[in-house]
UniProtKB/Swiss-Prot annotation:
Protein's organism: Methanoculleus marisnigri (strain ATCC 35101 / DSM 1498 / JR1)
Signal peptide: none
Biological process (GO), any one: translation
Matching Pfam families: Ribosomal_L1
Protein family according to the UniProt entry: Belongs to the universal ribosomal protein uL1 family.
PANTHER family membership: 54S RIBOSOMAL PROTEIN L1, MITOCHONDRIAL (PTHR36427), LARGE RIBOSOMAL SUBUNIT PROTEIN UL1M (PTHR36427:SF3)
Biological function: Binds directly to 23S rRNA. Probably involved in E site tRNA release.
GO cellular component: large ribosomal subunit
One function term, GO molecular function aspect: rRNA binding
Xref: SUPFAM superfamilies: Ribosomal protein L1
Protein name per the record: Large ribosomal subunit protein uL1
UniProt keyword annotations, A-Z: Repressor, Ribonucleoprotein, Ribosomal protein, RNA-binding, rRNA-binding, Translation regulation, tRNA-binding
Family matches, as InterPro entries: Ribosomal_uL1 (IPR002143), Ribosomal_uL1-like (IPR023674), Ribosomal_uL1/biogenesis (IPR028364), Ribosomal_uL1_3-a/b-sand (IPR016095), Ribosomal_uL1_arc (IPR023669)
Subunit relationships: Part of the 50S ribosomal subunit.
Length: 213
C-alpha cells in the first residue's frame, strides 16, 4: 500500500487546487475495488472505522429512556429519541427519512430494539444505520466519544465507496493519517488485501479529484 508521505502529498495537492471558500469543505476519498465479487455478501464491506483525527460534525442519536438518556445528555448527544417519539416517527415517513439521513450513528437500549425495528427499521436498515444495541447498565459515554471520531464504510454490491476523511481546516498530515487508517482497515477485510484496491482519489467538496493510488 502507498506510504503516508505519498498520501500527504496527494492531500496537499487536493487542498491547493480547491476553490477558495468562506467555509470548511469536507475532504473525501473515493476507493475503487477490483477482482472481487460483490454479489457475494461475504465480500461486502460494512465497517465502522475509528480515525486518529476526528472532525466535529459527526451526528449521533440515542434511542431510549432513563439512564441512557442521562448519559447521552452528559456528552451532548445530538438527538435523543424516546419510545413515544419512535412510534410517532414511524407514522411520519418524511421526518423519519430526514433523521436517518442526518444522523450518522445510532445507539439504542437493547430493550428498545424491537420497537426500533418495527417503526424505524425500514428507514434505518437500508442506510446501514440500525442502532448499536446497548445493554442495560452499559456506559455509553466512551462509545459516543469514539464514534465522534469514526466513519462508516458500507459497499453493498458496488465496487466503490466514498467516505469523509477530514475538512479543509485540518492539517494535511492529519487527513493523510485518517486516509491511511481507512485503507489499512479496508485492506484487512478484503479477500486479497491491497490487490483488491484498484485506485484511491482524494478531493474537497468542490475541488478536483487527485489520485492517491
Amino acid at each position: 500500500m502507498v506510504d503516508k508521505t505519498s498520501i500527504q502529498e496527494a492531500v496537499k495537492t487536493a487542498l491547493s487546487k480547491a476553490p477558495e471558500r468562506k467555509f470548511k469543505e469536507s475532504v473525501d476519498i473515493t476507493v475503487n475495488l477490483r477482482n472481487i465479487d460483490m454479489s457475494q455478501p461475504k465480500n461486502r464491506i460494512d465497517e465502522t472505522i475509528h480515525l486518529p483525527n476526528g472532525f466535529d460534525n459527526v451526528k449521533i442519536a440515542v434511542l431510549g429512556k432513563g439512564d441512557i438518556v442521562t448519559q447521552a445528555k452528559e456528552v451532548n448527544v445530538d438527538l435523543i429519541i424516546g419510545p413515544e417519539e419512535i412510534e410517532r416517527l414511524g407514522g411520519e415517513p418524511r421526518e423519519a427519512r430526514k433523521v436517518a439521513g442526518e444522523y450518522r450513528f445510532f445507539l439504542a437500549e437493547t430493550a428498545m430494539m424491537p420497537l426500533v425495528g418495527r417503526y424505524l427499521g425500514v428507514r434505518l436498515g437500508p442506510r446501514g444505520r440500525m442502532p448499536m444495541p446497548v445493554p442495560q447498565g452499559m456506559d455509553i459515554r466512551p462509545i459516543v466519544q469514539r464514534l465522534r471520531s469514526s466513519v462508516k464504510i458500507r459497499t453493498k454490491d458496488k465496487k466503490v465507496f466514498h467516505t469523509k476523511v477530514g475538512t479543509s481546516g485540518m492539517e494535511p498530515e492529519q487527513i493523510a493519517e485518517n486516509i491511511d487508517a481507512v485503507l489499512h482497515r479496508v485492506e484487512s477485510v478484503l479477500e486479497s488485501g491491497t490487490m483488491n484496491i484498484h485506485s484511491v482519489y482524494v478531493k474537497t467538496t468542490m475541488g478536483p479529484a487527485v489520485r492517491v493510488i
